[in-house]
């Protein structure tokens, strides 16, 4: 059974899920509830809601849709590995091996030209990664293409990039077979999975008894088809937040519309049913010849493209109409915000532009608003700093006016959380006394949240480093690195002064200077500065020069040991510079991360997680390459770029919903109900963000309905 619950309020859908868990078919106590979500924030909110309702929330799993679907493949079909051999990372390394062998072929003349000057393999690695990412999307949205390419066939009407993408995909499949890895991937598994479930007279062993899908704004068509087949044996409840009670999707053709007009949704907890269309008799006039619905509400039409496609797909998989449940909640028209929401809910357009005098004088659609209505406000500010200051003032006013409102009832969603984090810290963090608001910033990139992560990336750049004095001293700003060399804040202040006054500018020594094709001068290097500092400990500058070096007088007494600590740091930097310069096979890079962390960091309780994240991601990169049998030496720069990208993708979200004001990134899946919702950084060109597609992305050049593409 597959059932879709439509409601304009997520808390109503969550209450329905609680009702089903409590009243309908209780599971075996040892069988986990399966709830598909699209973000950890949604999972946290659902757990808290369950705990509040039942007193405890335990034995609940919150998988992402892609991992859940693959897990179902493993449970239903024989000989399916737990990890796909066609994951994005695995395909990247395999393409690194395959591409050089295929470049001499005529179809690859464009790639051959692009990779002609690539001594460090950086272009090859980037091309392999981008192509793997594209194939990963094809597996979900164009699986039929890959099946044809695998059979040696081309697709009519595709752009020229197909000429090399098709044979490259076939070579990738053959290479995977040569490695002895399973050739199963999502493109060739969906049909087999669906056919197996449809042919089964009883549920295959290991399937969950019940599955909820909550808080997901869109799923790809192949996922929905797989869930539809799974629904023959499993109770599947799709809880869909739908802003409009009437059908507002598009149609395929007139016959599809004829079936749709007869469909009805069953009203929750009632015996009556409700038609999908506001007026079924005139439904045919709503659609163009192409099947596009002319929505009367302009806001829903312009902002609801993703939802419109998803509505179409949901109506297709519940073609009988018996699986649709109406749980919409009426909205009173007592404020500006509620009027807008009510218009969307009822698919109305009561807006009056008032461009002409006649339109301005009309009153049939006008609604009276309270001059003091602040349910929806827009603030135009001259800078991000001012945006955050106004936000802080408004939140204080709201909390003062409403004694029942608490900081945890407020969410601030930011279009670019990384850019606004410094301003948020400056405004919210500097407030004291009655103006202080507890707050928690989620979803920042891990690299920006932990200085140790950025310090490690800087250390991986040692082979190319000029050892500029400020860059080296900046490493000591990281407490766990400074602690490894026994340098505290006061010691760092002394060292900054000494380094500047002793004339250190850049370069470890003269040999390092010569590496940049510059003549050695014997001055302004770290070796020169350390010599001056150590001489200053042994003699005074008034005694003259020693071997043409004038002693530096400040590094004397008990604090002179700082020079030794600084020298230890520079020795380690120089040693690792030489160690990291040569390309190595992946097996030899495996232990480098642990050794560098040991040599440069003395972790404390605050940074242990960051250190573990570095090692975890490093090992994942190495293991993926080794499992893909990539055996060529690679330079450190490739591993550094990949590690940097992965750390940027890691978002720190564990403090979301922890109690203070929730400040997070703006995500369509984070539709968690709050009493106050604030948006920051909604500037032109920033949101919605326009992402230019790859020049060889065949999907962007031949678009179809690609529901959920940006959210999988």
Model regions and ranges:
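Polyanion-engaging groove/track-forming segments
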Residues: 1-709
